[in-house]
Amino acid sequence: MAFNLKNRHLLSLVNHTEREIKYLLALARDLKRAKYSGTEQQTLKGKNIALIFEKTSTRTRCAFEVAAYDQGAQVTYIDPNSSQIGHKESMKDTARVLGRMYDAIQYRGFKQATVNELAKYAGVPVFNGLTDEFHPTQMLADVLTMLENCEKPLNQISYVYMGDARNNMGNSLLLIGAKLGMDVRICAPQALLPEDSLVTLCQQFAQQSNARITITDDIDLAIQGVDFIHTDVWVSMGEPLETWGERINMLMPYQVTPALMQRTGNPNVKFMHCLPAFHNSETTMGKQIAEQYPQLANGIEVIEEVFESSANIAFEQAENRMHTIKAVMVASLA
């Protein structure tokens, strides 16, 4: 079946086929090699891209900006403090304004409905840099990183997500594994597993791709022989301190420790994290949590010993955000 990614949105990967996702991964690999070898060709000269950030970011902003500059495009960074978005102007109107000035729009914020609305009214490609529900650019980077760190073909790679699986990382890792025919395992307390509607959708994708999906609260079942362990933060800034205790107590068995890595039975298992990670109490929020919960002074979702070990490939993930985002922009705009 022929496909065309020209002028395509990237909103969640729900509407991307297995072949389209694999094409983006192959393009990202090629662009990465070209950058490393100094042979990269600029294909986005004259393009202008708006970067809307309702949520702050380090990796997403830097990845989009560097990827755009590498390809000859110009970007404009827009945040709530420097625009009328959400204050005096609706997202619908913002989309119709920016769509007349820019060739594409990136959005990083809260509701998936917001990025969908942008895509509906902008008239230009819209790329989801993160919403509460999905994180598609991170998924492309994660799969590229797994391919680079495993000699198995894609359909034989196994990975598990540990922790609060109701968030964008749990949702997105379930989705992309189902799309690509991988062995994907979601491991969380029953109260923190993905929504049934998403699970049903991903099971349908898995039937088409021959993916293996395991959703469980049984840690030993989920991690057995796995190639990669993913996790994400358990708490977010702005959440009331009193709500942390119940969730932390629920998630403590799912903390990524050396013992948990060993329980996989795979001496080559790798650790992955979308970052930022609370692996010690050196940050402001890490200190705040450690004061309230002293048992977490050496890390929350992952402890320092794992994070600083050779098993950690999270910084390769972070770099691959740039290469995969570049692939998305080139495929859509070049």
UniProtKB/Swiss-Prot annotation:
<keyword id="KW-0055">Arginine biosynthesis</keyword>
<feature type="binding site">
    <location>
        <position position="321"/>
    </location>
    <ligand>
        <name>carbamoyl phosphate</name>
    </ligand>
</feature>
<feature type="binding site">
    <location>
        <begin position="236"/>
        <end position="237"/>
    </location>
    <ligand>
        <name>L-ornithine</name>
    </ligand>
</feature>
<feature type="binding site">
    <location>
        <position position="84"/>
    </location>
    <ligand>
        <name>carbamoyl phosphate</name>
    </ligand>
</feature>
<feature type="binding site">
    <location>
        <position position="168"/>
    </location>
    <ligand>
        <name>L-ornithine</name>
    </ligand>
</feature>
<dbReference type="InterPro" id="IPR024904">
    <property type="entry name" value="OTCase_ArgI"/>
</dbReference>
<dbReference type="Pfam" id="PF02729">
    <property type="entry name" value="OTCace_N"/>
</dbReference>
<keyword id="KW-0028">Amino-acid biosynthesis</keyword>
<feature type="binding site">
    <location>
        <position position="232"/>
    </location>
    <ligand>
        <name>L-ornithine</name>
    </ligand>
</feature>
<dbReference type="GO" id="GO:0042450">
    <property type="term" value="P:arginine biosynthetic process via ornithine"/>
</dbReference>
<dbReference type="GO" id="GO:0019240">
    <property type="term" value="P:citrulline biosynthetic process"/>
</dbReference>
<dbReference type="InterPro" id="IPR002292">
    <property type="entry name" value="Orn/put_carbamltrans"/>
</dbReference>
<comment type="pathway">
    <text>Amino-acid biosynthesis; L-arginine biosynthesis; L-arginine from L-ornithine and carbamoyl phosphate: step 1/3.</text>
</comment>
<dbReference type="GO" id="GO:0016597">
    <property type="term" value="F:amino acid binding"/>
</dbReference>
<keyword id="KW-0963">Cytoplasm</keyword>
<comment type="similarity">
    <text>Belongs to the aspartate/ornithine carbamoyltransferase superfamily. OTCase family.</text>
</comment>
<dbReference type="InterPro" id="IPR006130">
    <property type="entry name" value="Asp/Orn_carbamoylTrfase"/>
</dbReference>
<dbReference type="GO" id="GO:0005737">
    <property type="term" value="C:cytoplasm"/>
</dbReference>
<protein>
    <recommendedName>
        <fullName>Ornithine carbamoyltransferase</fullName>
        <ecNumber>2.1.3.3</ecNumber>
    </recommendedName>
</protein>
<dbReference type="InterPro" id="IPR036901">
    <property type="entry name" value="Asp/Orn_carbamoylTrfase_sf"/>
</dbReference>
<dbReference type="GO" id="GO:0004585">
    <property type="term" value="F:ornithine carbamoyltransferase activity"/>
</dbReference>
<dbReference type="GO" id="GO:0006526">
    <property type="term" value="P:L-arginine biosynthetic process"/>
</dbReference>
<dbReference type="InterPro" id="IPR006131">
    <property type="entry name" value="Asp_carbamoyltransf_Asp/Orn-bd"/>
</dbReference>
<keyword id="KW-0808">Transferase</keyword>
<feature type="binding site">
    <location>
        <begin position="57"/>
        <end position="60"/>
    </location>
    <ligand>
        <name>carbamoyl phosphate</name>
    </ligand>
</feature>
<feature type="binding site">
    <location>
        <begin position="274"/>
        <end position="275"/>
    </location>
    <ligand>
        <name>carbamoyl phosphate</name>
    </ligand>
</feature>
<feature type="binding site">
    <location>
        <position position="108"/>
    </location>
    <ligand>
        <name>carbamoyl phosphate</name>
    </ligand>
</feature>
<feature type="binding site">
    <location>
        <begin position="135"/>
        <end position="138"/>
    </location>
    <ligand>
        <name>carbamoyl phosphate</name>
    </ligand>
</feature>
<dbReference type="InterPro" id="IPR006132">
    <property type="entry name" value="Asp/Orn_carbamoyltranf_P-bd"/>
</dbReference>
<dbReference type="Pfam" id="PF00185">
    <property type="entry name" value="OTCace"/>
</dbReference>
<comment type="function">
    <text>Reversibly catalyzes the transfer of the carbamoyl group from carbamoyl phosphate (CP) to the N(epsilon) atom of ornithine (ORN) to produce L-citrulline.</text>
</comment>
